Amino acid sequence: MSERLRGSAVNAPAFIRFVKKCNEIGVAIHSFRFLRDSELVAAADFAPYTGKEKMHVYSLSKAFTSAAVGIAVDEGILSLDEKVSEIFPDKMPDVISENLSKATLRDILTMQSGHPRCVLDKIIENGDSLKTFFASEFTYEPGTTFIYSTAGTMVC
């Protein structure tokens, strides 16, 4: 492990215990970065990784998105109960269905948009992610049916 733990930003013994526990239970850590006020204050890379490799993060984007939305909610910029049709009026279809009109940011974040399936393939095909997401049929009343959807992350 190459590491840089400095100052009081990271409790080094606790971090080392965390890494050891991860190893014990079979969780492979490739790299670790801790930033405070946009400054890198701690870093660790675990062989064979150097921290310079490009990595696919897949569903990790959902965690980043949820954290960013949480910060915006905390700062009063957004409300989880805000209707997406009010947030993105210029991205709505010409005719807004009853279900789409009910969809909130919370519904999209919790994968309860009302879509019968993930519409990511349509978004990739059509290009405009927001217009495509909202133009897709909202079969279910938002907030009532969970359908795993990567597309919702793009909207939020």
Language-model regions, residue ranges each:
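Second-shell loop/turn segments in exported
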Residues: 4-6, 93-96, 141-143
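A short, well-structured edge-of-sheet supersecondary motif
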Residues: 16-50
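Active-site SXXK
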Residues: 38, 56-81, 108, 156
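Glycine/charged-rich beta-loop-alpha catalytic/anionic-binding loops adjacent to active sites
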Residues: 44-53, 134-140
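A structural signal for the main folded, soluble domain(s) of proteins
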Residues: 50, 60-63, 68-69, 89-94, ...
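Active-site helix/loop module of the DD-peptidase/beta-lactamase fold
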Residues: 56, 75-115
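Catalytic-site signature segments of enzymes, centered on catalytic residues
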Residues: 118-156
